[in-house]
Amino acid sequence: KAYIYPEYLPERDRDTTMFNTIEYYDKLLTEANFPHIEMTKWFKTMKDTLPYPIFPTMDNHWQFTSVYAYDSLFRFMDNLKHFGIPKIKYGEPQAYDLKFQSDEATLNLLFPVRDKSTDYKLDVEIECNDSCRKPQVLFVGDSFIWALNEQLPWEKLMEDIEIWFYNSDVYKGFDRKPYKKDDINMLRDMLKADYIVFYTSGHLWHRATYDFVEQALLTLCVSDSLMEVESIRIADSLGISKEEAIAKIKDYPGMIRGIMNCDNPSIRNE
């Protein structure tokens, strides 16, 4: 929200640096030819043309405008694999008044806010003909995912869903059954997904992917036997213990020889 409406920030919180994490990662991903969408610039343009607010005044998260984002995302995903994902259709936003907006609860106020902002809702339909297919999707990211459930009939859009919330807590299925990350089979869950979508909002880019990329590389490309050999080699070369070497590998998987040239990430399935 602060990236879309920086003009509402107090002067002390204005970004005066020359470094923009969104532009930085967008440039790197583009240079690597990695499929991604950078939506901040879209919404910054939309805020001057839409007759509605991109974000509600009383909420940190997007609401009806998330439908535009998810429509773009699923179209983008479909173009990558020509999967046949169902189409998202929506009309004009309809205004309604919220009696209590979710993020008001986080302010710890003695009295509720009197002048609440008007929010909007989209009537959303999912179109699926005989040739369409609903994908299984694994999402890894922050709390902006919950609008997918609140604003769209996600059971009509996807066959199944799994959410790795901040790459820590896991929610499986449309009923969001909770698991701890350590209790799931990470390799199996990644391989059964038709799509893996990592997403984040601007103010969290300093945490990059919440270690998801590092864990995915090790899970997909490094067998237990290779980890054993490489941890011993690195421990000997650095004069540290094997346990310390494993910790370093988890932070920097590129220390393992050949992992960055892993064109076929199925070594763990041998």
Feature locations, PLM:
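Extracellular glycan-modifying ectodomains
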Residues: K1-E270
